């Protein structure tokens, strides 16, 4: 199987980051707004899941198998569909990617490429299982919010396109 997670992607470098620095970054990212400082402290304990990606790197590949999703802490990425003429979205700090494969256990549906140097927080299934239940639930709730917001956005786009065609 074509598995490309942070562990397998030799271009992404594991970041040697202090808990204080990681906490400072998490405090600036809206994905973690509903976490208490003590919960964020616990998350920074998973320091081996912080990665640095350089501009232009492919972070995940369409069709690959992986069990991780990523929260962008700094930088910007492009979401790319194989046959699309241009990127289908750009994501910024606080956004996440890879959540579809993480939740469904299916192959990656898009590729993701860094548009700038990025710091990413990787969450995989084993890591999620080792997190305290309240943190795990908040992460899952945040993923649900992300998916609902994206679905609402897609519904709006489909409605506007339908009106143009009619």
Where are the model-predicted features located?
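Cytosolic regulatory regions built on CNB/CRP/Popeye-like sensor folds
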Residues: 1-166
């Amino acid at each position: 199987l074509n598995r490309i997670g942070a562990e397998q992607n030799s271009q992404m470098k594991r970041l040697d980051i202090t808990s204080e620095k990681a906490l400072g970054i998490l405090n600036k990212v809206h994905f973690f707004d509903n976490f208490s400082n003590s919960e964020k402290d616990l998350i920074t304990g998973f320091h081996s899941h912080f990665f640095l990606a350089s501009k232009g790197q492919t972070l995940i590949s369409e069709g690959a198998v992986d069990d991780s999703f990523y929260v962008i802490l700094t930088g910007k990425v492009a979401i790319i569909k194989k046959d699309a003429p241009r990127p289908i979205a750009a994501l910024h700090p606080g956004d996440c990617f890879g959540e579809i494969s993480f939740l469904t256990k299916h192959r990656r549906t898009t590729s993701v490429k860094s548009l700038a140097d990025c710091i990413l927080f990787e969450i995989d299934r084993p890591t999620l299982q080792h997190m305290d239940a309240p943190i795990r639930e908040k992460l899952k709730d945040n993923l649900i919010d992300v998916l609902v917001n994206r679905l609402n956005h897609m519904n709006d786009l489909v409605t506007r396109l339908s009106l143009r065609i009619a």
